[in-house]
């Protein structure tokens, strides 16, 4: 989709691993918009501290990742707010921590969202499970019909499904 509001820059970060079945959901989602839209798109195996600097140049970031959590619709789009968290591993940094680092280090307030898509299989395989593929298609439709138009309109805060009720 073209015609996005270039005054409000948005980056989509696809998180996952395309060699581990449903863990590829984030990357496959990013693939869909890498060439066909004005969204900036990047891929990550996992989030890194350096991503705080990257997203500081944007107004909005959408983190897309597979999830083991069961969801009624097979996907969930929700706001992500900056929050400091402490982990005893450098291999686990969540989106809220990245947003917090962006605000603390770069004094940048970036609107953040998490788009989680339910997955079921995580073994070494380059194919989505049948259920995850269905959720993926539903998530794409939702994103194209509800999220992209809001971004294109320059909406400063995208309403999540729970906020519409």
Map each language-model feature to its residues.
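N-terminal catalytic or cofactor-binding beta/alpha core of small enzyme domains
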Residues: 1-119, 126-138, 142-165
């Amino acid at each position: 989709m073209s015609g996005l509001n270039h005054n409000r820059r948005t980056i989509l970060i696809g998180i996952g691993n395309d060699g581990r079945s449903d863990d590829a959901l984030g990357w496959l989602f990013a693939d869909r918009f890498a060439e066909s839209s004005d969204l900036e798109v990047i891929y990550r195996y996992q989030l890194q501290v350096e991503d705080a600097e990257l997203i500081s140049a944007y107004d909005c970031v959408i983190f897309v990742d597979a999830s083991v959590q069961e969801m009624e619709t097979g996907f969930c789009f929700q706001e992500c707010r900056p929050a400091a968290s402490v982990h005893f591993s450098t291999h686990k940094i969540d989106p809220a921590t990245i947003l917090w680092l962006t605000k603390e280090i770069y004094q940048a307030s970036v609107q953040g969202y998490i788009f989680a898509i339910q997955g079921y299989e995580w073994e070494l395989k380059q194919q989505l499970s049948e259920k995850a593929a269905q959720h993926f298609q539903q998530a794409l439709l939702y994103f194209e019909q509800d999220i992209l138009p809001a971004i294109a309109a320059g909406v400063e805060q995208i309403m999540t499904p729970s906020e519409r009720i």
